[in-house]
């Protein structure tokens, strides 16, 4: 079983790291080629493509201009957005991190598919960006079936046929455009109970995705049915609103 997460825009390349054995991304060459192509874009062009401030655009233009010289850090510790606040990797023990390496995957516009301990350089490139190197119109075209093929290979290696989707729609589309055959896909839907009824809280859902990934690693869950026991931060599985392909979890407090 593999659980998929989105990456994060926020990065942390300064906090101390625990002792760990980092790994190399499988699509490192593709990432370098894309970064080199992005280095040819002006900061102004990057700002327009990514919808970011001039300051952020200049920062990322500089990163791409010297991409090979940028510091590397394991993906799980480099990303620091809401999902990774929920995951809180720095407080997990070594066996749980090892389990994450085997059972968690992070989707990426630049790197395609990452294991938690794969080394990455700082970047900003959302999967939905309407740009790609060469004659491709966007990153979905660039990646094609590569991400799904890699997921299928990883699942085959562990003798499993289940993907737990805790990624955003933007990133999940990179898999769903060419879904791996013969694989059961379960999408997690996180809601909150409010006075006006059930609501979708984007911030809360992102944190919940990370918390579920952490909970899975802490409890060494390898059967999706075990995830129905997820109870972090007041969440509980709800049969109402769930079906075979979508499982709803509701936060009641």
Curated annotation (Swiss-Prot):
Pfam families in alphabetical order = H2O2_YaaD
Q: Which GO terms describe its cellular component?
A: cytosol
* Disulfide bridge map: none
Write down the superkingdom of origin: Bacteria
Question: Tell me, which GO biological process terms does this entry list?
Answer: response to hydroperoxide
Q: Which residues form a coiled coil?
A: none
**Entry's family note:** Belongs to the UPF0246 family.
- Could you identify this protein by its name? UPF0246 protein Swit_4565
**Taxonomic source organism:** Rhizorhabdus wittichii (strain DSM 6014 / CCUG 31198 / JCM 15750 / NBRC 105917 / EY 4224 / RW1) (Sphingomonas wittichii)
